[in-house]
Each structure stands twice: as C-alpha cells, then as structure tokens.
Amino acid sequence: MQLFHLCLIISCSCPTVQASKLCLGWLWGMDIDPYKEFGASVELFSFLASDFFPSVRDLLDTASALYRDALESPEHCTPNHTALRQAILCWGELMTLASWVGNNLEDPAARDLVVNYVNTNMGLKIRQLLWFHISCLTFGRETVLEYLVSFGVWIRTPPAYRPPNAPILSTLPETTVVRRRGRSPRRRTPSPRRRRSQSPRRRRSQSPASQC
C-alpha cells in the first residue's frame, strides 16, 4: 500500500495523458517529461527560483476565478485545461496522503520528514505545473515558452553583459525584439494631390425631385 501511495505522489508530477504510465516509467527508467508535449522541458524551470512560483492556494484561487467553468465542464477544452484538471486532482490526493501519513506514523520525526518532503519537493512540482498551465491559458503558450527561454538566457549571461532587469512575463510581448503576434501596420505614403483645373466648374442646378 505504501508503494502505491508513493507511485501516486510521483504520478502527480505528470498531469497529462502520460500520467498513468509515469509510475511504470519510474520503475523501468523511462524518460517522461510532463512539459514535453507542450514544447517545454523540466530544465527550463531549473532557472526559476522556488519562491518565484506563487503558493498552491493562490494558484488554485486564480484557476478557479478564471477557468472554473471550463475546468468543471465535461467537454474537452484544450490540453492545458486537461493538464490543469489533473494537477488540481493530484494536489488533492497529495493532501489526502499527507493526512494519512500524519495519522498513521507514530514516530513524530519520521512523520515530519515525510510531510516536509511532500510540501517541499512535490509541492514545488505542483506549483510549477499549475503556474505553467495557468500562464499558458492566460498569456498564450508561445509567450510563456518565449519567457522561459528569455529568462534562461538572461540568468546565464554575466551581469556585466545583460540588462539590469529580468524579463517579465506580463510585459514580454511589448519588450521582445521579435514579435510573433501580428504585424505592424504598413505606413502608406501620401499620394500627390491632384491639381485643380483653373477653369471654374459649373454648378448643376438640382431639380426639386432629386432632393431627398
């Protein structure tokens, strides 16, 4: 039973269609990345500090406020909605498991170690997953991927050769050099005005029938 719960914890780090296979992948050494199908990777998140991601409670409140109808809908919306649903369910399972461990382990030190590991390590993975999918739904997947790459390049650049401020996701589309969304409107050169003829034109007299 404990091995089953351990597999549940590990599977929560992959809330996609591959989640059911992750426990087997862990046993047989399969390389399964929960972000791969979305164009990202776990390595891209290694550049972001743990305190960068909001708390699980704040992320759940954001998901509920913005996408509750879509998350509760029985219809398929987008892969990000599906992954977000699974991440929320996995967090609920983790909290249930943490309560079970707290009620069944008699050794307080061992209980604290398990609960702390769940909150620190698995909690961080859940926060990363929630943040990624909520951001993809809010800003667009391409913008989020561009932000992760831009931040990785910025943090790896020596301070003397990089801008003082790190990229910000909410302002990324306005500050990036290469814009992927739309094109700037083409400026039209003014056409030369036509020269009016010097001869005066006769004004046509309008008949009463033609007036509206």
Swiss-Prot record:
Annotated propeptide span(s): 184-212
Identification of the protein by name: External core antigen
Site feature location: Cleavage: 183-184
Record's subcellular location: Secreted; Host nucleus
HAMAP family, alphabetized: HBV_HBEAG
The species this protein was found in: Hepatitis B virus genotype F2 subtype adw4q (isolate Senegal/9203) (HBV-F)
Keyword list, A-Z: Disulfide bond, Host nucleus, Host-virus interaction, Repeat, Secreted, Signal, Viral immunoevasion
Any one of the GO CC terms: host cell
Start-end of Basic residues biased regions: 178-205
Record function comment: May regulate immune response to the intracellular capsid in acting as a T-cell tolerogen, by having an immunoregulatory effect which prevents destruction of infected cells by cytotoxic T-cells. This immune regulation may predispose to chronicity during perinatal infections and prevent severe liver injury during adult infections.
SUPFAM superfamilies to which the protein is assigned, alphabetical: Hepatitis B viral capsid (hbcag) (SSF47852)
Signal peptide interval: 1-19
Pfam family name, one: Hep_core_N
Subunit structure: Homodimerizes.
Chain's gene name: C
MF annotations from Gene Ontology: DNA binding; RNA binding; structural molecule activity
Region feature (3 X 8 AA repeats of S-P-R-R-R-R-S-Q): 184-206
InterPro entries with a match to the protein in the record: Hepatitis_B_virus_capsid_N, Hepatitis_core, Viral_capsid_core_dom_sf_HBV
Residue span of region Disordered: 165-212
Primary localisation category: secreted
Post-translational modification as stated in the protein's UniProt record: Phosphorylated.
